Amino acid sequence: MNKAFFLCLVVLCAAVVFAAEDLQKGKHAPFKRAAPCFCSGNPGRGDLWILRGPSPGGYGYTSNCYKWPNICCFPP
């Protein structure tokens, strides 16, 4: 019984270590809280930010169009 308990404990610890390592990789992935949108006069797909005034910084947006009360922001 002690050997089985020890083996389960080792497997549990290994699973926690590998899960934590996988979560560390996920932290560096970019994540936007925006929906896709389209505006006439702007090529391609933009990001629709709901109930927001200007385009948020840090995402590299170069142009936008307003769809009141939302904004559609376009990357370069």
Swiss-Prot record:
One GO BP: regulation of blood pressure
Paired cysteines (S-S): 37-72, 39-65
Modified how: Lacks the conventional Cys residue at position 55. Thus, only 2 disulfide are possible present.
One protein family per Pfam: Defensin_4
Keywords for this protein: Cleavage on pair of basic residues, Disulfide bond, Hypotensive agent, Ion channel impairing toxin, Nematocyst, Neurotoxin, Potassium channel impairing toxin, Secreted, Signal, Toxin, Voltage-gated potassium channel impairing toxin
Classification via InterPro entries: BDS_K_chnl_tox (IPR012414), Myo_ane_neurotoxin_sf (IPR023355)
Parts of the chain that traverse the membrane: none
Primary site of residence: secreted
Tissues expressed in: Experimental results show no expression in the ectodermal tissue from the distal and proximal tentacles, body wall, and oral disk. Since paralogs are expressed in this tissue, an expression of this toxin in this tissue is probable. The negative results could be explained by the very low abundance of EST sequences.
Keyword Signal: yes
Pro-sequence residue ranges: 20-31
Any one Gene Ontology molecular-function term assigned to this protein's record: toxin activity
Compartment list: Secreted; Nematocyst
Segment forming the signal sequence: 1-19
GO cellular component, one term: extracellular region
Protein's job: Blocks Kv3 voltage-gated potassium channels. Reduces blood pressure.
Recorded family membership: Belongs to the sea anemone type 3 (BDS) potassium channel toxin family.
Protein name according to UniProt: Kappa-actitoxin-Avd4n
